[in-house]
């Protein structure tokens, strides 16, 4: 039986993805239905992460048009925010703190694979709402992009897409992606993918946030429209 308090939370807590309210086994399905488009592309020179900027209330009302859905979590890594705003921000704070603690104790940065694995452990065991982020970064082994599902599964790929705009964005990337492409080309492709998703997906829109990740660090920029990002 559905709890009225949960219904109230569902309706009024801002989301950058989904806030689950029933069977936890349906978390990933719900994330895909209710909002946001996040894209991660790896190249030989680094990683590009792109997201839209829209947050919604209950998936029906646009509550914010300037959300930064990408955060730096490591000297050479970033992660997207997907889920309720509070849950996603708490998740990133916890992950960033663990990565910093590791670096202090070991006097070396966490590898991107270990960082993604830690994110998966947090997603599975923590009190976070439908976390389905992308982790992208660069380490001694090269460029990496991982998707983390709500059950804690961690998968590495050359590129990945999460959120309700997944099908449209993936279709845009599929025929044009090449691991040997330049960072500039990957940036343009990521922008086109998010823009295409925003044209058809009501949960995505209002510009784009871009993160460019190399072995020198992370640079994050936000744009109100797709033309100015190109």
Curated annotation (Swiss-Prot):
<dbReference type="InterPro" id="IPR001353">
    <property type="entry name" value="Proteasome_sua/b"/>
</dbReference>
<keyword id="KW-0888">Threonine protease</keyword>
<feature type="compositionally biased region" description="Basic and acidic residues">
    <location>
        <begin position="1"/>
        <end position="10"/>
    </location>
</feature>
<comment type="similarity">
    <text>Belongs to the peptidase T1B family.</text>
</comment>
<dbReference type="InterPro" id="IPR023333">
    <property type="entry name" value="Proteasome_suB-type"/>
</dbReference>
<keyword id="KW-0645">Protease</keyword>
<keyword id="KW-0963">Cytoplasm</keyword>
<keyword id="KW-0068">Autocatalytic cleavage</keyword>
<dbReference type="GO" id="GO:0004298">
    <property type="term" value="F:threonine-type endopeptidase activity"/>
</dbReference>
<dbReference type="GO" id="GO:0005737">
    <property type="term" value="C:cytoplasm"/>
</dbReference>
<dbReference type="InterPro" id="IPR000243">
    <property type="entry name" value="Pept_T1A_subB"/>
</dbReference>
<comment type="subunit">
    <text>The 20S proteasome core is composed of 14 alpha and 14 beta subunits that assemble into four stacked heptameric rings, resulting in a barrel-shaped structure. The two inner rings, each composed of seven catalytic beta subunits, are sandwiched by two outer rings, each composed of seven alpha subunits. The catalytic chamber with the active sites is on the inside of the barrel. Has a gated structure, the ends of the cylinder being occluded by the N-termini of the alpha-subunits. Is capped at one or both ends by the proteasome regulatory ATPase, PAN.</text>
</comment>
<keyword id="KW-0647">Proteasome</keyword>
<feature type="region of interest" description="Disordered">
    <location>
        <begin position="1"/>
        <end position="29"/>
    </location>
</feature>
<dbReference type="GO" id="GO:0019774">
    <property type="term" value="C:proteasome core complex, beta-subunit complex"/>
</dbReference>
<keyword id="KW-0378">Hydrolase</keyword>
<feature type="active site" description="Nucleophile">
    <location>
        <position position="36"/>
    </location>
</feature>
<comment type="function">
    <text>Component of the proteasome core, a large protease complex with broad specificity involved in protein degradation.</text>
</comment>
<dbReference type="InterPro" id="IPR029055">
    <property type="entry name" value="Ntn_hydrolases_N"/>
</dbReference>
<keyword id="KW-0865">Zymogen</keyword>
<dbReference type="Pfam" id="PF00227">
    <property type="entry name" value="Proteasome"/>
</dbReference>
<dbReference type="InterPro" id="IPR019983">
    <property type="entry name" value="Pept_T1A_Psome_bsu_arc"/>
</dbReference>
<dbReference type="GO" id="GO:0010498">
    <property type="term" value="P:proteasomal protein catabolic process"/>
</dbReference>
<feature type="propeptide" description="Removed in mature form; by autocatalysis">
    <location>
        <begin position="1"/>
        <end position="35"/>
    </location>
</feature>
<protein>
    <recommendedName>
        <fullName>Proteasome subunit beta 2</fullName>
        <ecNumber>3.4.25.1</ecNumber>
    </recommendedName>
</protein>
